[in-house]
């Protein structure tokens, strides 16, 4: 716990005792008195002997100085109180400590002489003599022969090596455990028994002890006290000089509650705890050594106890009852008459003279002193549960009885063999009636059991049997033989008990003999143990004396299966032991043939004795031990369940009231009643067989013995209906409202087949949401029904039904119940925080109609199950009537109902978490009685202590540790309620549930209970807090999990005194001022308030620091996010750029790949075309005709070829150089007829395309126009070829279809003018077929061959038929023709030749493109001069160059500089016609670069152009007229289209339709910059052919520079400065409009 934290003081400081004041017989106010000083031991060896005789010496070993659990004594002088640097409230004295002393001349040793002489024998014996209050803790040697004896006699393999240390001297108590609290009055099973002490038997540390000793010895000896050394030690576990008490008058952490003198208890029952009416004992050193007495030095290892207080005469008892039987002193019997039933305890655990342990004979056990006058010993009576009706005598050499017959193996009855069943019956007949323990405290015996041992001085003397000596508890002693008679004072030996560590169990076991296996209890009569089996001869038993006490039992989790079986057998035999006078006699006085008498009626011990193990466990809480493994815990749980049910059965059949003994760990009254009903029904159903008259334990095993009570004496079972109803209440399904009856199960659980059903260890059932009551705690059926009737619950379900059958669940919000099936829940669903659809609106998986139908099915199923159960129960009644013990006409007897235990009213409300916590805790013994008394006798009420201030004020004198009032209200956990820290607002926080018996922390910090007294409470809500409280809160746990939190006084409180409580544990966390009752006017004077303010200031500073840190963290986080966002954006931008670059690269690669693939496709197409041409040329002619179907397919192919041709033309035009223009097609169309004679070619006349198609091939008249048929040809007829006549030019056809033949009929033209080889001579096939009638049908191969011939002879475009036509299934005649291998070779050669030609052509194209690129680069590098006209088109550059060469004129400054023209490779004469495009490109490029004097190669032109060209050549003379440059307004020649937006009136050089003058015109160019007038040159207008060629040479994609030049500049740039031409007319007024119109771009720009 942190420094400065306020905690409640220890119990001995809370409940401080007032001093002994003889002058004040009545105590009105608590008087503080310092305790007696505890003297240390002098280090001086010459110290006086009187110093060591001081009764208050506190010998301390120096090894215990730094032990964790060492408790230091207090310093009595107030002036020596050290200042502890911790926070302490007002009026609170910190504990004082005495420094541990060195072990020099300690334990009351006599003063040594100067020569350090050794002690004499008398002095040694005097030093070893124990005091009258010496307490020994039994501890055995691991190698003792006692284990073998007990194993041979009782089949109980004991072992104590798990707990005992190797050194016997340390077995009293380990140094690590701290001072051991001597709990007076423990029996062998560690149960607290009622005790009484003689009036002069007080502890050596109590007041008046030294005076009495001085009187007995004849005078007092002077004593010298030594000032003790002071040493400040830290507080150990907040246990500061805690008095070692046996029990406390009420519960602290689960201990029992007990009243003195309550009716039903023994009249001699002494109050336990720190009381003023009886002695209490405390060990004085770490090893349990005793104090010196009469100047004798006790042995080093002898324990001693010091009385905390003395018995005060004429003092009022704390809990005085009217029914008490007088005071303690009146109940003490005469000293000379020892009380029967008491034990003589072991005095010495280790012998003085040697290593062999020897028992010393007490003075009253010596020969000749039994019953003599010298026997004045007084024994402390310890009441046992074993009856003692006669005097017992045991002789050490008594003969041993024969071993009892072994019982048969615990086998299920239906699995027993006939021999086993017969043997079991025989054993049941031979055994005596079962004997149960009786309360010996309520009847007296004549004499005490004393064992005589005449030869005790010899170490080899015959030793008594272990059963006789250990059960008698009267060891022999030799010490009193050597002590003078005058020193033999009444010796009250501390009893010898066996310490059992039960910390492995979570709850105490009510019956000590059933909770731990294999241990001898006080209920075991010695003669039964002696007669059970004769002691076997043990080899090592004779030479040594037996050790002290019996061995410690083996822990349950370490027992083997054989040990468990032996323990179960012993549990049964414990209940068979006789208690009559004849059976208690020694074995020689009770013959075996005498039948034992029936057992007497029994009176059980009080309830408080059942909780004894909890106190013993709390003593050893601080003992370090190894944690249990999961396997050990599982074994412990199983064995604990078995033993708990055995304890229930044992106590239930012992003759006591079932309602009073059903408060056990293993089950509640309802559960025990259920078991008894079922058990009695089984007995009634099966008692016709003798072997079936056995008791079946709840633990699942069968008891082979008959029941303790005859079957006729057992109460009849209740009716089956009541049994079923009680079972349904106790075991209702999860979520069912309490009180609703579950329908009967269809089939009862079968328990045949030998199956052993083990109920769960902690069987929890559903708890009520209102008052937290559990059905299992109800004592009867009527009680459960009453509770159900009192409980109010509301069923509001989705289905609309309000019945409570089936599985239901409660809403935590509105506290209403719903059917789980209607809510869509199952038993496996998580319903920890369930809320209905009203509190938590949501869509339910089940609709209302489905929910109603489901509930109807559930109700029908439950009704059917109830009817089925009713039918099944009928044969049971018939079987019961057929029993021989009952008449057929007689009806079965009604089952009697067990009497109900009075219920305790529920004055508190409990939350669910609080109810779950309380149901897991054990009930406190006597809690109901204490709660009833506190509610009946209220010692305080609310009053006005100031104006408008109410408080709780006492109305009577309240003594220390008395209950003032019970706090009532709503009990909940600390996390379920909003409260003010420190206390207030009528809410009390209680942390006692986390405290153990000694006040140490037992919980995990989450078991803080809060009681809200605002809504439901009593006058305790007005209790105020104070820094000097006079009360505290304590709790008890009553029946039905009733938590009673009471206000208990920590000091004597007078009448009309305000009751105050300490602040809650979290008072430092309060943000408001504490309301201290002592400092209401000056809160600053309250130390708690000052401390709270300091903590609040620190807390505020810490909060401010946290806020600053949080703000800094937030800002840093924002900055970090901002930087991250910037980095993210930068990265995104870079990534986007990289993605775009990558995308562009991929697109470029894709485009390049696509272009490459397109080129490859074109090349493949070209190659395929050549292959088809070669194959068609080699294919033989066939006279077969085609069908109408083939004709239609040809027409479809023809249309597709036309579209493919157009698409190919468009693609080729985009890839061509700028020299290829749309005019090439026209030039190519007219170039085929240039070589025709001028006389045979008439003037060109346009004709529509339709007329050309409809001209007949066979009958063609010699007219100037094509013959046009009146109707188009039918689809099923052969397409007719249209052949133009001789007089009609073929240049008008822009596009020629595959079937259109544009060749002239006259084939007499010279062969020199035609560029073909194979068809240069002779007539063409078309001309031949035109003279004859073409048959209606012919073969497909013939058509293909004819088309290819026409393509070579005429201007018909070449095309390739698709593959599906070529590969189409042909007729039988064509299919039968076999291919010729010579044709295949020729085809291969042709393919190679075509590939070579294609390669050359591609190289030529690349060279032309390279020259063009070079020319463009040079043009960009040349700077543009002033007044220099724009660059002329490519076709004009050649004209300018030619003009310069012809006229030999000097350069003028106005003439643009000549630009170098790229040298093109010389053209080679082609052997064949490659195509129209190639011819056009070659002709245009050749004309632009050739000189005027060169003779041009003949071209395919029309006859009209041919004639005009010849006439122009004659007129020009030696030079040829250069081709005219394309000017603004000229449109490329297009067939069938009109000129748009053409204005030629202002252009005198052109052949305009408005001017018929063909004379030469002289044009004078203007002078530029004062240059001399050049000579005029007569230039004729260019011909139509020249304009056509100029227009054809203009690129569509290139906008000529002449468009932005004036007419004079264009003429000057074309013809130079010597051009003589008439001046142009003045411009019109709207010159701007004209210029704008001219500068407007057209669709050809």
From Swiss-Prot:
Inactivation phenotype: Exhibits prolonged lifespan, increased resistance to heat stress, reduced brood size and changes in gene expression. In a glp-1(e2141) mutant background which lacks a germline, extended lifespan, increased H3 protein levels, decreased levels of trimethylated histone H3 'Lys-9' (H3K9me3) and 'Lys-27' (H3K27me3) and changes in gene expression. In spr-5 null mutants, accelerates the progressive sterility and accumulation of histone H3 'Lys-4' dimethylation (H3K4me2) over generations which is seen in spr-5 mutants.
EC number(s) from the headed UniProt entry: 2.1.1.355
Zinc finger feature spans (PHD-type): 794-842
Catalytic activity: L-lysyl(9)-[histone H3] + 3 S-adenosyl-L-methionine = N(6),N(6),N(6)-trimethyl-L-lysyl(9)-[histone H3] + 3 S-adenosyl-L-homocysteine + 3 H(+)
Enzyme class: transferase
Coiled coil location: 1103-1217
Functional summary from the UniProt entry: Histone methyltransferase that mediates trimethylation of 'Lys-9' of histone H3 in vitro. Involved in transcriptional regulation. Plays a role in the negative regulation of lifespan and in heat resistance. Together with set-9, negatively regulates lifespan in a germline-independent, partially daf-16-dependent fashion. Together with set-9, plays a role in germline development and maintenance and might play a role in the restriction of the trimethylation mark on histone H3 'Lys-4'(H3K4me3) to target genes specifically in the germline.
Pfam families: PHD_5, SET
Protein name (record): Histone-lysine N-methyltransferase set-26
InterPro entries xref list: SET_dom (IPR001214), SET_dom_sf (IPR046341), Zinc_finger_PHD-type_CS (IPR019786), Znf_FYVE_PHD (IPR011011), Znf_PHD (IPR001965), Znf_RING/FYVE/PHD (IPR013083)
Organism taxonomic ancestry: Eukaryota, Metazoa, Ecdysozoa, Nematoda, Chromadorea
Localization of this protein: Nucleus
Keywords: Coiled coil, Metal-binding, Methyltransferase, Nucleus, S-adenosyl-L-methionine, Transferase, Zinc, Zinc-finger
Domain SET: 973-1064
Tree of life domain: Eukaryota
Organism: Caenorhabditis elegans
Entry comment, domain topic: The PHD-type domain binds histone H3 when trimethylated at 'Lys-4' (H3K4me3) in combination with a nearby acetylation (K9ac, K14ac and/or K18ac), but not H3K4me3 alone.
GO cellular component, one term: nucleus
Basic and acidic residues: compositionally biased ranges: 559-578, 1099-1172, 1188-1210, 1382-1427, 1434-1450, 1468-1485
């Amino acid at each position: 716990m942190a420094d400065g934290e306020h905690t409640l003081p220890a119990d001995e400081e809370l409940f401080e005792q007032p001093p002994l004041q003889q002058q004040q017989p009545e105590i009105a106010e608590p008087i503080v008195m310092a305790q007696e000083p505890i003297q240390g031991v002098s280090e001086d060896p010459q110290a006086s002997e009187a110093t060591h005789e001081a009764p208050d010496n506190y010998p301390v070993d120096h090894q215990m100085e730094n032990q964790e659990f060492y408790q230091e004594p207090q310093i009595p002088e107030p002036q020596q109180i050290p200042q502890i640097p911790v926070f302490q409230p007002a009026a609170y004295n910190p504990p004082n400590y005495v420094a541990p002393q060195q072990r020099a001349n300690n334990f009351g040793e006599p003063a040594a002489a100067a020569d350090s002489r050794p002690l004499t024998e008398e002095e040694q014996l005097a030093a070893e003599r124990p005091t009258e209050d010496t307490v020994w803790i039994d501890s055995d040697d691991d190698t003792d022969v006692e284990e073998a004896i007990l194993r041979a006699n009782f089949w109980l393999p004991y072992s104590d090596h798990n707990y005992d240390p190797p050194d016997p001297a340390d077995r009293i108590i380990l140094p690590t455990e701290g001072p051991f609290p001597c709990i007076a009055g423990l029996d062998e099973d560690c149960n607290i028994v009622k005790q009484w002490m003689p009036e002069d038997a007080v502890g050596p540390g109590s007041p008046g002890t030294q005076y009495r000793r001085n009187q007995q010895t004849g005078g007092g000896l002077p004593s010298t006290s030594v000032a003790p050394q002071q040493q400040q030690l830290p507080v150990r576990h907040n246990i500061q000089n805690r008095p070692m008490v046996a029990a406390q008058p009420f519960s602290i952490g689960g201990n029992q509650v007990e009243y003195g003198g309550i009716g039903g208890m023994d009249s001699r029952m002494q109050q336990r705890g720190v009381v003023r009416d009886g002695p209490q004992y405390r060990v004085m050193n770490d090893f349990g050594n005793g104090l010196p007495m009469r100047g004798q030095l006790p042995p080093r290892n002898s324990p001693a106890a010091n009385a905390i207080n003395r018995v005060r005469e004429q003092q009022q008892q704390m809990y005085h009852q009217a029914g008490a039987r007088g005071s303690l002193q009146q109940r003490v019997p005469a000293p000379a008459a020892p009380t029967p039933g008491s034990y003589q305890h072991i005095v010495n655990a280790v012998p003085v003279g040697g290593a062999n342990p020897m028992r010393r004979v007490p003075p009253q056990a010596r020969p000749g002193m039994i019953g003599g006058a010298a026997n004045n010993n007084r024994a402390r009576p310890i009441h046992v549960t074993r009856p003692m009706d006669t005097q017992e005598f045991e002789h050490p050499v008594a003969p041993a009885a024969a071993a009892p017959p072994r019982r048969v193996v615990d086998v299920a009855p239906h699995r027993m063999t006939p021999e086993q069943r017969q043997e079991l019956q025989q054993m049941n007949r031979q055994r005596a009636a079962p004997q149960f323990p009786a309360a010996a405290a309520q009847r007296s015996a004549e004499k005490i059991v004393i064992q005589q041992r005449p030869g005790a001085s010899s170490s080899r003397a015959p030793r008594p049997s272990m059963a006789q000596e250990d059960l008698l508890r009267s060891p022999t002693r030799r010490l009193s033989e050597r002590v003078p008679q005058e020193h033999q004072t009444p010796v009250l030996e501390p009893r010898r008990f066996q310490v059992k560590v039960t910390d492995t169990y979570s709850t105490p076991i009510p019956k000590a003999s059933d909770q731990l296996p294999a241990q001898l209890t006080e209920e075991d009569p010695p003669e039964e143990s002696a007669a059970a089996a004769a002691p076997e001869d043990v080899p090592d038993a004779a030479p040594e004396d037996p050790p002290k006490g019996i061995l410690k039992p083996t822990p349950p989790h370490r027992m083997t299966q054989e040990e468990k079986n032996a323990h179960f057998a012993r549990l049964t035999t414990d209940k068979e032991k006789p208690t009559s006078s004849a059976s208690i006699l020694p074995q020689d006085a009770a013959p075996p043939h005498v039948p034992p008498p029936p057992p007497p009626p029994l009176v059980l011990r009080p309830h408080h004795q059942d909780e004894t193990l909890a106190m013993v466990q709390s003593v050893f809480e601080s003992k370090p031990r190894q944690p249990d493994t999961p396997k050990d815990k599982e074994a412990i749980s199983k064995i604990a369940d078995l033993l708990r049910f055995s304890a229930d059965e044992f106590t239930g059949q012992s003759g006591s009231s079932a309602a009073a003994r059903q408060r056990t760990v293993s089950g509640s009254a309802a559960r025990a009643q259920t078991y008894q009903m079922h058990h009695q029904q089984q007995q009634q159903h099966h008692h016709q067989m003798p072997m079936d008259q056995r008791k079946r334990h709840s633990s699942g095993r069968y008891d082979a013995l008959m029941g303790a009570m005859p079957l006729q004496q057992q109460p009849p079972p209740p009716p089956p209906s009541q049994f079923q109803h009680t079972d349904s209440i106790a075991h209702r399904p999860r979520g069912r409202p309490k009180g609703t009856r579950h329908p009967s199960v269809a089939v009862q659980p079968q328990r045949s087949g030998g199956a052993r059903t083990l109920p769960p260890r902690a069987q929890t059932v559903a708890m009520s949401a209102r008052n937290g009551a559990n059905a299992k705690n109800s004592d009867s059926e009527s009680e459960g029904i009453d509770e159900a009737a009192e409980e109010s619950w509301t069923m509001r379900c989705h289905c609309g039904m309000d019945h409570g059958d089936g599985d239901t669940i409660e809403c935590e919000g509105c506290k209403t119940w719903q059917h789980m099936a209607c809510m869509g829940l199952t038993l496996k669903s998580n319903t920890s925080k369930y809320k209905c659809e009203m509190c938590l609106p949501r869509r339910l998986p089940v609709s209302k109609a489905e929910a109603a139908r489901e509930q109807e099915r559930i109700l029908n199923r439950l009704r059917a199950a109830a009817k089925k159960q009713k039918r099944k129960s009928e044969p049971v009644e018939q079987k019961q009537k057929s029993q021989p013990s009952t008449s057929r006409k007689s009806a079965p007897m009604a089952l009697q109902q067990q009497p109900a235990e009075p219920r305790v009213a529920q004055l508190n409300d409990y939350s669910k978490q609080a109810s779950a916590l309380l149901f897991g805790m054990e009930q406190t013994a006597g809690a109901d009685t204490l709660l009833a008394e506190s509610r009946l006798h209220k010692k305080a009420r609310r009053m006005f202590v100031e104006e408008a201030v109410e408080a709780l004020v006492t109305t009577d004198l309240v003594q220390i540790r008395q209950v003032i009032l019970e706090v009532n209200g709503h009990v909940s956990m600390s996390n379920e309620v909003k409260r003010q820290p420190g206390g207030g607002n009528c809410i009390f926080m209680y942390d006692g549930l986390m405290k153990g018996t000694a006040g140490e922390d037992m919980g995990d910090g989450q078991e803080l209970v809060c009681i809200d007294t605002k809504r439901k409470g009593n006058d305790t809500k007005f209790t105020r807090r104070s820094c000097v409280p006079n009360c505290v809160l304590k709790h008890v746990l009553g029946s039905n999990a009733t938590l009673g939190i009471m206000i208990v006084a920590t000091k004597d409180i007078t009448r009309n005194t305000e009751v105050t409580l300490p602040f809650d544990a979290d008072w430092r966390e309060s943000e408001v001022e504490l309301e201290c009752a002592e400092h209401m006017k000056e809160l600053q004077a309250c130390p708690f308030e000052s401390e709270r303010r300091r903590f609040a200031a620190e807390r505020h500073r810490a909060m401010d620091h946290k806020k600053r840190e949080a703000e800094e963290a937030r800002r840093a986080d924002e900055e970090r996010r901002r930087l991250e966002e910037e980095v993210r954006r930068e990265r995104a931008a870079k990534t986007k750029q990289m993605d775009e670059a990558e995308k562009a690269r991929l697109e470029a690669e894709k485009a390049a790949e696509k272009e490459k693939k397109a080129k490859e496709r074109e090349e493949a197409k070209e190659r395929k075309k050549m292959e088809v041409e070669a194959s068609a040329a080699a294919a033989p002619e066939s006279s077969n005709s085609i069908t109408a179907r083939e004709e239609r397919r040809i027409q479809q192919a023809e249309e597709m070829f036309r579209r493919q041709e157009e698409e190919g033309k468009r693609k080729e035009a985009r890839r061509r150089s700028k020299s290829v223009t749309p005019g090439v097609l026209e030039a190519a169309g007219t170039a085929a007829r240039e070589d025709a004679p001028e006389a045979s070619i008439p003037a060109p006349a346009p004709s529509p395309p339709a007329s050309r198609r409809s001209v007949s091939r066979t009958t063609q008249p010699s007219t100037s126009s094509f013959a046009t048929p009146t109707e188009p040809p039918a689809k099923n007829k052969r397409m007719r070829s249209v052949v133009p006549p001789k007089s009609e030019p073929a240049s008008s056809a822009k596009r020629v279809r595959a079937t259109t033949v544009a060749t002239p009929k006259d084939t007499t033209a010279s062969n020199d003018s035609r560029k073909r080889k194979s068809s240069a001579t002779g007539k063409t096939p078309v001309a031949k077929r035109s003279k004859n009638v073409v048959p209606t049908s012919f073969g497909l191969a013939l058509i293909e061959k004819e088309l290819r011939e026409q393509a070579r002879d005429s201007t018909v475009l070449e095309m390739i038929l698709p593959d599906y036509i070529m590969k189409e299934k042909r007729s039988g005649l064509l299919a039968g023709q076999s291919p010729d291998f010579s044709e295949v070779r020729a085809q291969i050669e042709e393919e190679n030749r075509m590939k070579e030609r294609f390669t050359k052509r591609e190289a030529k194209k690349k060279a032309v493109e390279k020259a063009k690129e070079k020319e463009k680069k040079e043009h960009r590098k040349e700077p543009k001069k002033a007044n220099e006209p724009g660059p002329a088109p490519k076709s004009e550059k050649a004209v300018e160059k030619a003009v310069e060469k012809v006229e030999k004129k000097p350069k003028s400054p106005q003439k643009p500089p000549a630009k170098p023209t790229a040298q093109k490779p010389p053209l080679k004469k082609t052997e064949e016609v490659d195509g129209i495009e190639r011819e056009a490109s070659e002709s245009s490029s050749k004309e632009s670069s050739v000189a005027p004097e060169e003779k041009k190669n003949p071209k395919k032109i029309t006859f009209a152009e041919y004639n005009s060209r010849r006439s122009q050549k004659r007129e020009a003379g030696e030079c040829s007229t250069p081709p005219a440059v394309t000017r603004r307004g000229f449109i490329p020649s297009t067939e069938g289209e009109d000129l748009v937006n053409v204005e030629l009136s202002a252009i005198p050089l052109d052949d305009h339709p408005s001017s018929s003058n063909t004379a030469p015109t002289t044009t004078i160019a203007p002078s530029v910059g004062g240059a001399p007038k050049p000579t005029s040159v007569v230039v004729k207008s260019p011909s139509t052919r020249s304009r056509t060629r100029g227009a054809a040479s203009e690129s569509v994609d290139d906008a000529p520079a002449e468009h932005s030049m004036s007419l004079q500049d264009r003429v000057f740039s074309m013809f130079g400065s010597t051009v003589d031409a008439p001046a142009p007319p003045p411009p019109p007024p709207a010159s701007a409009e004209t210029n704008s119109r001219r500068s407007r771009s057209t669709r050809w720009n």
